[in-house]
């Protein structure tokens, strides 16, 4: 990968390493999918780390980081990794929040990505999709965007089944980015 893309994956690896208390294996930057070509250099990477430290997510411990998933939608297999999952148990109900870190300079994230992640996590955990929320964190600005409502399985089946290009948005096969 290009040096800038490598720094993008290094940001994701840094977030994972930051939460050392998790019992997950630490992945090396080259083992992680994706990357962000908009991370210019080491100074920019440090600026992203500093910006992350100012977000609400820096003070919360994720339940899972870089959580892999595989999901079949409209007869197509979608594989990927969810950047972070936060779990909330209020005693009566367990809910989850999926967060996708966006390290680029633009706001080009597609809510369908979160819809796929949400469905994958809900089905993996055996919980209703309504108990899973999802957000993009634009790390550079600290802005959190929670698209709502997100389509469920039936709507995703219709959307992805109707795609004439044969590509699946945000799957590894289609080159999902960060």
Please provide the spans of the model-predicted regions.
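Residue-level signal for well-ordered alpha-helical scaffold segments within enzymatic catalytic domains
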Residues: 13, 17, 116-119, 141
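Beta-sheet entry/capping signal
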Residues: 62, 95-97, 133
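Metal-dependent nuclease catalytic regions and adjoining charged, substrate-binding loops involved
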Residues: 121-178
